Amino acid sequence: MSLKRINKELSDLGRDPPSSCSAGPVGDDLYHWQASIMGPPDSPYAGGVFFLSIHFPTDYPLKPPKIALTTKIYHPNINSNGNICLDILKDQWSPALTISKVLLSICSLLTDANPDDPLVPEIAHIYKQDRKKYEATAKEWTKKYAV
């Protein structure tokens, strides 16, 4: 079931790709994809390209894919290992979700961080206390690692 679903999503992505995102298999392994997200223009990540690795479990879509950023990013909901704190990748996962929808949710997270559910409390603190400093550091990291 999982391979059939993964193939359908790959076909749908090719036919109707989400804006500012792309994704596809690494080599012949349909369970391992690479994706990219363009930094949203209205965010400190504008101009950056962020790469992600996607691993589908064999029981996908019953279980969520494992997704990690492979590009370093300064964000309260994404840690230095690239782990992403996003409810739909954990307890709010639904088999109705697709990789396309997940990538768009990650894009939204880049625009609207959630400092109240941080993966990196120090960055969340700066985000809440000194937004200018947060945005300056995020822009600096984007230039350094994502351009």
Curated annotation (Swiss-Prot):
Keywords: ATP-binding, Nucleotide-binding, Transferase, Ubl conjugation pathway. It is an enzyme of class 2 (transferase). PROSITE patterns: UBC_1, UBC_2. It catalyses: S-ubiquitinyl-[E1 ubiquitin-activating enzyme]-L-cysteine + [E2 ubiquitin-conjugating enzyme]-L-cysteine = [E1 ubiquitin-activating enzyme]-L-cysteine + S-ubiquitinyl-[E2 ubiquitin-conjugating enzyme]-L-cysteine. Residues 1-147 form the UBC core domain. One of its GO terms (molecular function) is ubiquitin-protein transferase activity. Its EC number is 2.3.2.23. SUPFAM superfamilies: UBC-like (SSF54495). CDD domains: UBCc_UBE2D (cd23792). Pfam families: UQ_con (PF00179). The active site is at 85 (glycyl thioester intermediate). GO terms for biological process: protein polyubiquitination. Pathway: Protein modification; protein ubiquitination. Signal peptide: none annotated. Belongs to the ubiquitin-conjugating enzyme family. This is Ubiquitin-conjugating enzyme E2 4. The gene is UBC4.
